[in-house]
Amino acid sequence: VPGFRHEEKFTLNDPAVQKSPLADVRELILKPVETDADAARRVREALLGMGREGDFGRLGEAAEWLARWQRRFPPRIEKPTLAIFAGSHGIVDAGVSLSSNSDTRAHIEALKGGRAPLSAIAAQAGATVRVFELALDRPTPSIAKEAAMTERECAATIAYGFEAVEDQPDLLAIAVSGAGVGTAAAAVACALYGGSPDYWVRPSAQTPASLSGKRSELVSAALKLHRGHLSDPLEALRCLGGRELAACVGAIIAARHQGIPVVLDGFATTISAGVVHAISPQAVSHCLASHITQRPAHEAALERLSLAPLLQLQFQTGGGLGSATAIGVLKTACAPFIAKPVEG
């Protein structure tokens, strides 16, 4: 992020610093960022020259959004990155997930080795896959017993998320991997938006009802334990979330300050954006919802952020499939503005 380095902005190891480490994060979220309204206007004018208003539908809207946030015309995607943030959760021991922390490790190893289906989809889109492992061998504590992170750990993890933009991509797609992350995200959603745990842990049709009950009980216990901290979105993230959610928050913040559009994936990344949105709605205007999963809570979260999904492909969950697929669609949105005319 222009103007500071991680070690300068987050003086996490300086005992002389009295304010909360998360105060710096809040300041970055609230700090205004300039966009390029002229580039967006040129997209609109070019579209009108290609046909009637609205002919290009969501593609036209996406092109305008890209130009505004890339701060250039024509918009183009030449260096996209797909960032996968992987974490582990102590709540898995309570039986709230169909997968385990060892499954997360296996998935990450497959991604790093280029063997996962997601690797092929990202390659087809021309995206670089970057995997960020967040202490996979040290699960966060069960949020029903203690906070997921200390203030310093949460702030440091948010700062670590800044590294997703260190290669200066012109589009950043984000996703998470972690058994239990959906339940943690549901707990954060309860704190941000209210409603019952049952509402936010609502599963897809393939999830056993018994699992939903365990998730709801755990979220209820966590909300009761941390009830004195949940009026602050960053505190809700710290107490109820996980490292991958915090790193996504950091990636979203850093991308905005560097003029990099962000493509969200599933429910968990949407809730990470929700944390930022709860502090400043304008601070997520550079984010686009790639798709909508079959998890009902995902649709509810998108509604809270006033985000319409670009795609509806009936994916069961996130995991990067939606955000990776959307990269190709967004490249298509740019094509009319950068195509060279064919000479007859």
Label every PLM stretch briefly:
Residues 2-5:
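Extreme N-terminal basic, low-complexity initiation segments
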Residues 8-344:
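N-terminal loops that bind phosphate or other acidic moieties
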